[in-house]
Regions:
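Short cationic amphipathic helices and targeting signals
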Residues: 159-167
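Charge-rich, low-aromatic oligomerization/scaffolding segments with amphipathic character
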Residues: 173-176
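ATP-dependent small-molecule kinase catalytic core of the GHMP/sugar-kinase superfamily
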Residues: 27-141, 145, 168-169, 179-191
Length: 191
C-alpha cells in the first residue's frame, strides 16, 4: 500500500504548512523519503506517491533524485483490496537474505515489465514476483484466484498479507468483502 510512505509524506507536508517552514513540497518529500527508509518501514515509495496514477520507478531515490515513468491508463480504474493480516516490513527488508532475494527477483521482473509496460503485464509480473520471492501464502493466493475471475488480474501487495486487483468494472465486486478505491491520476493534492 505504501502506508508508511504516505504517512511520512503527509506529516512532512502538514508540518511544513502548519509551522510555515520555507520548504518546497519536493524538499518535504525528500525528508519523508529519508524517514521511511531510515526507519526500515519501506524502500522508497514516497517518490511514486508524489507522481500520478500508476508509475514505474526507473531510478531509485528520493523525489528529485530518483525517477518515475508514468504508465498511461485510458480508463477510470479501480483498485480492489482485501487485507487478511499484516506483515512486519522491517523484519523482511532488514533481513539480508530476504532483501537479496527481493532485489534479484525485483530486478528481473522490472526488466521484463520495461519491455512492455501495461496494466496486464504489471499484474502478471507482480504476481510472479510474489511467488518467486516466496512471500505469497495460500490464503492470499485464494483471494487472488477469486479476484482474477472478476478483474484484469490480481497479485499480492508488498509487503503484507493483502491481495489487490485492478479493474475498470466494479459491478461484480462484493463491497462487503473487498475495499474499492478509484485510482487517482491527477497527482498529489495539496490542501
Amino acid at each position: 500500500f505504501g502506508t508508511s510512505a504516505a504517512s511520512a509524506l503527509g506529516v512532512s507536508l502538514a508540518l511544513t504548512k502548519l509551522i510555515k517552514l520555507p520548504i518546497s513540497p519536493l524538499k518535504a518529500g525528500q525528508y519523508a523519503h529519508i524517514v521511511e527508509v531510515s526507519l526500515g518501514t519501506g524502500l522508497g515509495d514516497v517518490i511514486a506517491e508524489m507522481e500520478k496514477g500508476l508509475v514505474l520507478r526507473i531510478k531509485p531515490g528520493a523525489p528529485g533524485y530518483g525517477e518515475c515513468e508514468i504508465i498511461n491508463t485510458n480508463n477510470d480504474l479501480y483498485i480492489i483490496t482485501k487485507t487478511l493480516s499484516g506483515l512486519k516490513t522491517k523484519d523482511i527488508i532488514t533481513n539480508p537474505k530476504e532483501k537479496e532475494k527481493i532485489t534479484n527477483v525485483g530486478l528481473k521482473m522490472e526488466e521484463k515489465f520495461i519491455k512492455l509496460p501495461s496494466i496486464n503485464t504489471f499484474l502478471n509480473y507482480s504476481y510472479q514476483f510474489a511467488e518467486q520471492t516466496e512471500l505469497l501464502n495460500s490464503k492470499v493466493k485464494k483471494v487472488i484466484d477469486d479476484l482474477n475471475t472478476k478483474t484484469f488480474g490480481a497479485s499480492m501487495a508488498m509487503l503484507g498479507n493483502t491481495a489487490f486487483a485492478i479493474t475498470d468494472n466494479i459491478s461484480e465486486i462484493d463491497t462487503d468483502e473487498y475495499a474499492i478505491s478509484k485510482l487517482y491520476t491527477d497527482g498529489i493534492k495539496y490542501l
